[in-house]
């Protein structure tokens, strides 16, 4: 029975009621057919209320279950909630059921169950009508059954306003599938600040969305230049919580731009050094993705993934065993695609494998060579393009992967001791942990955030301040300093050298923790000190930057001297500093000069290390040679320690530069002022001392010019001495002739009475002087001849023979003079005068003979000394040549032995490889025969 619409009901309700009335009139059965109409029994009303409660509870349970299952999707409104949809379904259901029953059963079966189906349909229609009437009573105040259950118009309109409130709820905006409508970051931060409870789901979900967007943007902006800055910004977020998002974004970014795989691998390596579990998760996901694409035969994705894995191997994130497993998998059953993928993988990580696993790389290339040879023999040949790729890979290996470096210098950011290598293989990586990509409520959110904040401060310190805030802070600091400047009246000075000790410790630890000298120089140069007078960062007592540089240079020299043996690391480091700035070069030059001044206080080990350091700096022209200008190679100005120091320096210079190059450097006229004291030319005695010193240490070749200068000086001195001797002999002969003429005049005047006696006495007195004068001129002539002959010949024996002849001639002349005087009898004063003359003449002759003997003795001594020195030099040169020849023979024998050992090992490996291949072929042949036999 249908009701007429009430005039007090709203228009929409009246339309629904009219529509229901039309449907009831069009239905095939009437309400009277239903024995359980809601107007007939109150018991049915109670059952309807209980069924309504059950349906509500089941709806709530279903909604809660759907919320737990899909937290990010809002509860969708079902179309069944509308009465209009129910009415359409109600009108459709009989025909559908009839059509299904007609299709599913035969006609006889339909006739037999006709009554039962009619009853079932009538019961379902009555049940739908009752539920429809109840919903209509709830919606329309004019259709309510009792005044007790009536509702106010405000309450009736309230359900229509609830969906609008839900649209404005930020929680529902973030629960949708795409994250809801776009919310600007400023508005999202404002919404997040308005939530006081940080452990609530709404706050954590907002934080998750913000973190996801920021990580995605940072990963997309990374490149080789801003890698460090991007890492610092990434670590500002909780990467432990968002490691799934981070790994997903890195993999997606690498897949979109495979050319930047090395950049993303460097980013992963930096994060892996601080958070190893993130690097392991990334590697595991890549391996799972590689296996999935390999099974699907997706070559493009496989090539991109193995490029990323190869660069992770280069960055020491993944172990090289993973590379070998991939190569074995690709080349075990070679195809065009697998060989192409393997060669692409080798290009990326071949340089690293050559460095850390050369034997494994050789086996891989042997397999490629075998594949190429099998391709040429068999009918099932690979594509010609793949064969060319294998040949290209062989050429790349021959060039030692020069075009494919393992790690670019700009991306080599992790120290070797900080690298953490994950030994995952293809079988271990199973679970990619995709559940980390979705949001999960954290009951201990604040505690975990505080823990990560402490970790972040340990890694990168406090968060960076924006430029505006920095300027404000700097302005505030300047104002505060300007205000506090007049107040400062006292200053505390620390004289305990604690700052110096701390600085030296820092420099020493920096040197010990550096891998090579370039890294050490970079770290030491980063230790900046302000140029102002007050230094509060490292050293409080150092007032200027130049003093800081001097202290650093002295520390480097001390570290080099303290080593047990000389280390080339310090020489290369100091050379780098000298080439960087002139201030460092001048500082090291001053230190070298001070070292020679205090060399007697240094023990032999430090002395040797410092000498080798100075020799290295001189040979590389890192410092100037003027540091040797203070060295004076004389017996008075040198000590034993100083001579040992100079000896070590020149021995190292010869070893580094060679004798010829060092000799040209020493004889260079532009550097003559640097070696004035080393090779003195002012005093022959000092020159002999320098010559003897360099000859004793086996470097007599450096003193050739000094020897020539000394020989020229000796010859010049000898010429001067000979001239003086000739002048002295001529003056002696003239004085003798004048004395003889005076004596003859006196004898003529005294004996005037006796003419015969006077004439005889005058004749006898005149004849001997004439003979003596003649003999004097002859002797002078002969002496000049003998001197010329001696200079021409330079023979000591000829000189001695001439001297003996001269002495013999003089003795014969004296004997003849004495015999003539004895033959002529003298009397009185004449006899006495002639005796005095003989005595004076004999004294002069003896003194002259003594001088000649002394000159000859000194000449013989000098010649013997020169001969002895030449013999020693010759013996030393022979010994050094023999030692060098022995060393060369040993080196040649060692190189020959190494070459033979290498050849033997290679031949052994080839034989083993050939034997292994033969066994494998034999096994394959036996297996194929067995299969053929079974078939």
From Swiss-Prot:
Key word Zinc present: no
Matching InterPro entries: ARM-type_fold, CWC22_splicing_factor, Initiation_fac_eIF4g_MI, MIF4G-like_typ-3
Any one of the GO CC terms: catalytic step 2 spliceosome
Subcellular location: Nucleus; Nucleus speckle
All residue ranges annotated as the MI domain in the record: 502-633
Molecular-function annotations in GO: RNA binding
Top-level taxon of the source organism: Eukaryota
Biased composition (Low complexity): 729-763
Extent of Acidic residues compositional bias: 465-483
Record field: compositional bias (Basic residues): 84-148
Residue intervals passing through the bilayer: none
Sequence ranges of Basic and acidic residues compositional bias: 13-25, 49-70, 159-175, 780-891, 897-935
GO BP of this protein: mRNA splicing, via spliceosome
Alphabetical keyword list: mRNA processing, mRNA splicing, Nucleus
Domain MIF4G: 212-400
Region Disordered: start-end pairs: 1-179, 463-489, 725-935
Family in the record: Belongs to the CWC22 family.
Role this protein plays: Required for early embryogenesis and tissue differentiation. Required for pre-mRNA splicing and for exon-junction complex (EJC) assembly. Hinders EIF4A3 from non-specifically binding RNA and escorts it to the splicing machinery to promote EJC assembly on mature mRNAs. Through its role in EJC assembly, required for nonsense-mediated mRNA decay.
Name of the protein: Pre-mRNA-splicing factor CWC22 homolog
Organism: Caenorhabditis briggsae
